[in-house]
Amino acid sequence: MRHYRHIKTILHNRSVFNCRTPLFKIQALARLLDRKKKKNIRAISAILSISKTVEDMIGQFDFAASILKGNEKWQFSDEVRNQILIQYGFALGTLEECLLQLGWITRGKNVIQFDDFGFEYLKSALKEISFPSSKKEKKQILQLFKNICMDIDEDIREKKIDLTHIEDGIHEFRRDIRWLSIYASALRGKVILSNNPETDPFQHFITPSNMESRYNTLLINEDEKNILTFQQGGFYALGALISDLGNIKDKGLTTEYLMQLGTSKGMSEEDIKAKLGEDYQDVATTIQQATEKINQFVLEEEGFIKLANHFEAQLQ
C-alpha cells in the first residue's frame, strides 16, 4: 500500500550505475495502481510515460556504451570505430536532451547539473493516488502474480511467443518474466522469501552464492502485517533464468549489430567473427541457447506452474 509512496524515495536514490533499476521499480509500482480509480489515472499516466521514456533512453545509451567498451578488446578498424563513436555520441545526446526536456537536468556553461523540477512534477502526481487497504492489496498482488505465471506458461506451451526472434520473442519473454522479480523488490517488504527449503520445489537453487547475491534479497518491513511469500528457490531460479537470457540476448544483439556495421564498411563476416572472438554468437546459436533455457524451466521443470501454485495457496 504505502510502498507507492516510496517512489519518492526511489527518485532521490538514483545511482550512476545500474540506474535503470529504480526506473523499473517506479514503473512496477505505477502498474499496480487501480486504473478504475479516476484519481489514479493522471498519476499512472505521468509516472509510466516519463519513467519508461527515460529508461528506454538509458537502455539505448547502455548498449552503445557496451559496444564502445567492447571495442577496446575487439580493436575494429578506425572506420568502424568512428561509427561506434558516432552511435555512442548520438545515444548520449538523445539521453541528455530527454532529461533536459523533462526537467531532470539543466545545462550550464561547460556543466550539466541535476534539477529538481522534473521530480517535483512526478511527486505532485503522487498526491492524487488512491491506495487499497493492506489486506486487499495482498490479495490483488497474489492474484496478479498467479495470473502472470499462468499466462507466461500458456504463452510458451501454445507458442504465442515466437522464440525464433531475438528482440520480439526472446527479449519480450524476458521482459515479461522480469516483472515478477521487479514487483517483489519494488514493494519493499510486502513480499518476502519463504523459509521452507526442505519442501521448496526449487531447493537446488538455494545455495550460498544465490543467498548472498545482492540481486536475490528482498527488504523486510516489520510494520507490514499482510505479507505474502515468494518461494525462495523459485525467486532464485527466476533470477538465474533472467540473468542467463540477458547474457545470451546481449551477446547475440552485439554480434548482430557489429555484423551489420562491419559488412557496411566492407568487412567480411569471417573477419568480423575473428575480431569478436569468444564474444561472437550468431542468431541461430542465440535462439537455440535461449530456447533451451526457456523450455527447460517452463516445460520440463514446470517452473511457472509451481510458482503459480504457491501464490494460489496463499489466496485460500
Language model feature labels by segment:
Residues 1-316:
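Function-determining surface determinants
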